[in-house]
Amino acid sequence: MSESAPTPRRERVIVGMSGGVDSSVSALLLLQQGYQVEGLFMKNWDEDDGTEYCTAREDLADAQAVCDRIGIKLHTANFAAEYWDNVFEHFLAEYKAGRTPNPDILCNREIKFKAFLDYALMLGADLIATGHYVRRRDRDGRTELLKGLDPNKDQSYFLHAVGGEQIARSLFPVGELEKPEVRAIAEKHGLATAKKKDSTGICFIGERRFTDFLKQYLPAQPGDIETIEGKVIGRHSGLMYHTIGQRQGLGIGGLKEAGDDPWYVLGKDLQRNVLLVGQGNDHPLLFSRALLASRIYWVNPVELERPRRLRAKVRYRQSDQDCVLEKTAEGYRAVFDEPQRAVTPGQSVVFYDGDVCLGGGVIETAEAWDFGGRP
């Protein structure tokens, strides 16, 4: 598909083909670079209700069309059992415990860079490749994970739990490009996915309402909505349907004495099954000075004998925040220079040294910011 014949390489690469434009262009670029390229389409969720919420059939058809266009073989593999055991059951357990998990992070660690990698190696591959917007760099005998070149698409946050050994066996061809360039390449070469919309949301939920999906697996436990002063002002249908900083969907209204400021979720009292709320986008209890994280995964070993100044994200697409990270008896504690809004237990905090993604962990608790004095 390239204008000039590439120099052949011995390495055999199997590309995880999702049916999207990023993996499509990744396969094309690797062909142009002379690799021996094949594709593999993963099915990670079994639709047992007769509907195609994940559009798996359409995605497979698109992946096949791209592979036919560029002249490579497409394998298929079903990792639904591994996904259920290693990702989905954890997802449910976290929601049951009142936290807000991010299944994409565990999916990358357990499925795309473990089950898929192992399967590809079994097929005789030397390397795998994906359409993630990240980069890798070999330095000082180890492989580092770097942010993608396009700051609007960088996905290092979601890959922070993948180890350096797995990164070393992986290629990320679009990590050096910006999204418009990727679409332009796909269009130039007539790929069926050139104008396909990016997938959003969690695969196994698809177009369904999140609350409707969760009700299939976890029984709802309605309870009171209280102000931080202890006044009951409404009812919630289940703590698992709400997250810190949430404004929409609280169903609070008609409180004349409360004024017009919108209500936000400030916290959850799990023992009493109470949702705690307050008014105002800048409510002090929405901000944290520090957090405690556990279940830490480092891409490569990190030296933390003493507190270390780093940068961090507490959510995807957040700008990097200055902090000091230290290891304590309770876990890893990050103290931020500036107040952090809506730090959410169950979500991930990811640490950076410049463009290098060092790793991260799961937020357990957050410490409120004291606006009355020194933080």
Curated annotation (Swiss-Prot):
Binding-site list for ATP: 16-23, 42, 131
Gene Ontology BP, a term: tRNA wobble position uridine thiolation
Cross-referenced Pfam families: tRNA_Me_trans, tRNA_Me_trans_C, tRNA_Me_trans_M
Function statement: Catalyzes the 2-thiolation of uridine at the wobble position (U34) of tRNA, leading to the formation of s(2)U34.
Family membership noted in the UniProt record: Belongs to the MnmA/TRMU family.
Cystine pairs: 107-203
Example of a GO MF term: tRNA binding
CDD domains in UniProt: MnmA_TRMU-like
Keywords for the protein's UniProt record, in alphabetical order: ATP-binding, Cytoplasm, Disulfide bond, Nucleotide-binding, RNA-binding, Transferase, tRNA processing, tRNA-binding
InterPro entries reported for this sequence: MnmA-like, MnmA-like_C, MnmA-like_central, MnmA-like_central_sf, Rossmann-like_a/b/a_fold
This protein's name: tRNA-specific 2-thiouridylase MnmA
Any one GO cellular component localisation term in the record: cytoplasm
Organism field: Pseudomonas aeruginosa (strain LESB58)
Domain of life: Bacteria
Residues forming the catalytic site: 107, 203
